Design a protein with these regions (language model features):
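Conserved ATP-binding/catalytic segment of the ANL
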Residues: 102-174, 183
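Conserved C-terminal "lid"/linker of ANL adenylate-forming enzymes
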Residues: 165, 189-194, 204-205, 222-277
Length: 277
């Protein structure tokens, strides 16, 4: 709506908004500020949750800006849990049959949620239900998201558990790295993926540039990316268009990007990523 509001009548309509909610994927504060300019009378919220349990947490733009001053590289702050919801950060263990151990404040792990309004289960999908609701009671829901709780009790989302890059130096989450590069370069979309075996994966940064050729980035761009983040970067690549979920334009298909990046680094024939499926 905001992107298409080019006429005076549409802009006046947006000016009458009182509350705006944006959810479904990590929302950059820059995006919220742009919407705020079009709807100056609205309070902007980014509630966090999922189909199985919503809401889990909530935050408005003013609180996001305060959180980002405290930690500009923490990921996406989605606020404190709403009344009645409990959030736990647990070890990432895809094979756990019981609730994984809880981690200390500030530690990155999988986000687990308990609330009276969590859905009852999954109809006929027993393996999914066992994985999502571990333990004999099954009252904790494994979100599949990763993040951390800070000292103020705020929840930060850092990406998906399946997208964590397991390097020899430790795990690297996708969202904080991508946001740091996007801000430094002033670009709309970046993908951080891992190439190689789990435990010794190499971090590869793929920058979306409509004018670039799919393949290795130029030396200046690569240097700018490496200056933007503290993690060692094995390679910087560019693509004309990053592949996204057919239903959600904000959700990059990192599995496809990682496979393509592996081919590039292995010296195989570089194909157009947007047509790679």
């Amino acid at each position: 709506v905001a992107a298409s509001a080019r006429t005076t009548s549409k802009l006046l309509g947006l000016a009458g908004l009182r509350v705006v909610f944006s959810a479904g994927a990590p929302v950059a504060s820059e995006t919220l500020r742009a919407i705020s300019e079009l709807a100056p009378g609205a309070t902007l919220h980014t509630p966090y949750g999922m189909t199985e349990v919503l809401p889990v947490a909530d935050i408005d733009l003013a609180a996001i800006e305060l959180a980002e001053r405290d930690d500009p590289n923490g990921g996406v702050c989605v606020g404190r849990p709403v009344v009645g919801a409990e959030v736990r950060i647990a070890e990432i263990d895809f094979d756990a049959e019981d609730v994984p151990p809880e981690l200390a404040t500030g530690s990155m792990g999988e986000i687990l949620i308990r609330a009276p309004w969590v859905s009852d289960g999954y109809l006929g999908v027993w393996a999914t239900e066992r994985a999502a609701r571990p333990g004999p009671v099954g009252d904790w829901h494994r979100s599949g998201d990763v993040g951390h709780l800070d000292a103020e009790g705020r929840l930060w989302v850092e990406g998906r558990a399946v997208h964590v890059i397991h390097t020899a130096a430790g795990p690297v989450t996708s969202v904080p790295v991508e946001r740091a590069v996007e801000r430094a370069l002033g670009v709309a979309r970046v993908a951080a993926v891992g190439v190689g075996p789990v435990g010794s994966q190499q971090l590869v940064i793929v920058v979306e540039d409509r004018d670039a050729t799919d393949g290795p980035a130029g030396s200046d761009l690569a240097a700018s990316v490496r200056q933007a983040i503290s993690e060692p970067v094995a390679s910087v690549l560019t693509v004309g268009r990053l592949p996204v979920d057919i239903r959600h334009n904000a959700k990059i298909d990192r599995a496809v990007v990682a496979s393509w990046a592996g081919d590039v680094l292995a010296g195989r024939r570089v194909r157009n990523l947007s047509r790679w499926r």
